[in-house]
Design a protein with these regions (language model features):
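Conserved active-site tyrosine of GNAT-family acetyltransferases
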Residues: 116-117, 121, 140
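Beta-hairpin "wing" of winged helix-turn-helix
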Residues: 125-126
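Acetyl-CoA-dependent GNAT
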Residues: 3-75, 86-88, 92, 96, ...
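Short coil/turn segments at alpha/beta junctions that flank glycine-rich nucleotide-binding fingerprints
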Residues: 79, 96-99
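C-terminal "cap" of GNAT-fold acetyltransferases
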Residues: 99, 106-110, 129-147
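Conserved acetyl-CoA-binding loop-helix of GNAT-fold acetyltransferases
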Residues: 72, 78-91, 110, 114-118
Length: 147
C-alpha cells in the first residue's frame, strides 16, 4: 500500500490527543483538538500506509505557515516517515501558495533538528526559556516556492 496524506477526521482525534500529551507533555484535550478543527487557520494532516504513521499540525495564514507539531508514532520511527510527511506537507503548501514556513524545535531534539536541516530549514533565532522546563527553542525558517 502506498503512503498517503489526508486531513484528519473525527476518528483521529483521540490519537492526536494521546500523541500530543505523550510526546510533547502538553495538556491537550479532545475539546481543544475539536476546536482546532473548526478554526480555518489550523490544519492537521495524517500520514497513512494501512495504519496511521504520524501527523503534522500547522497554522496557515495567507502566504505563511507554522508547524506546531510533527509526530511519527514511536513504532513507526526510523523508517523515513518524518521526511515523507514533511515533503508531502511542503508540496501541499507550495500548491496553495505558501511562501514562508517556520517552526520551533528544542535544541535537545536532535532527530527533529537533523530532519529539518535535511529539508532545508535554517535556524534564524533562539527563543530563550521557551518551553515549560526552561529549555530554549530554535526558531527555524524555510522559504517555499520559487523566486
Amino acid at each position: 500500500m502506498k503512503l498517503t496524506m489526508r486531513e484528519i477526521v473525527k476518528e483521529d482525534i483521540d490519537l492526536i490527543v494521546q500523541c500530543e500529551n505523550e510526546y510533547f507533555h502538553n495538556f491537550t484535550t479532545k475539546n481543544k483538538v475539536e476546536d482546532d478543527l473548526s478554526n480555518p487557520l489550523i490544519h492537521y494532516y495524517i500520514l497513512v500506509k494501512e495504519v496511521v504513521l504520524g501527523y503534522i499540525n500547522l497554522w496557515i495564514d495567507e502566504d505563511k505557515a507554522q508547524i506546531n507539531s510533527l509526530v511519527i508514532l514511536l513504532e513507526q520511527r526510523k523508517k523515513d516517515y518524518g521526511s515523507k510527511l514533511l515533503e508531502f506537507t511542503i508540496n501541499k503548501l507550495n500548491e496553495i501558495g505558501i511562501r514562508d514556513l517556520t517552526l520551533e524545535v528544542r535544541p535537545s531534539n536532535t532527530a527533529a533538528l537533523k530532519l529539518y536541516e535535511k529539508e532545508g530549514f535554517k535556524q534564524v533565532s533562539v527563543r530563550k526559556n521557551y518551553y515549560n522546563n526552561g529549555e530554549d527553542a530554535f526558531l527555524m525558517y524555510k522559504r517555499l516556492g520559487s523566486d
